[in-house]
Amino acid sequence: MAANRWHIQFHYDRRGYGNLRLVDGGVEWEGCCRTGSIDLAGNLVHSIDPGEWLIRAHTIPTTEDSMWIFDKARGWKVRLHRKAGDAWESTSYLIHPDGGRPGTRGCLGIQGTDAPELRDMIDQVLDGQATISVFVCRED
């Protein structure tokens, strides 16, 4: 999985929900998830910056895949990249299921009630078989 890459695009409405699209085999599904929160002034905060990012599965020194479940937050981590002028920006975001820690930076809602179910859903997203969480388009 370390060499796989996906493109992710984030757009937000006034309530902080991201407009998402999963493209798999030429079929498109529409969906949305909460990717930020709204402060008292009505501004979107704690969100991933709008625009296109590149998500890449990578390994950590233990050779364990980086997309692993955090026990307390019940989430997973990915590394996002995007071109900023002549350089690349890189950042990691914690992604957790709905009901975990809403409003934290980089929160992407993934519906899951327990760790095994969440892992299955993550696998489905990365395999292009689910319509949840992120705009994902597999890069060949």
Each model region followed by its residue ranges:
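Beta-rich, blade/repeat-based domains predominating
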Residues: 109-110
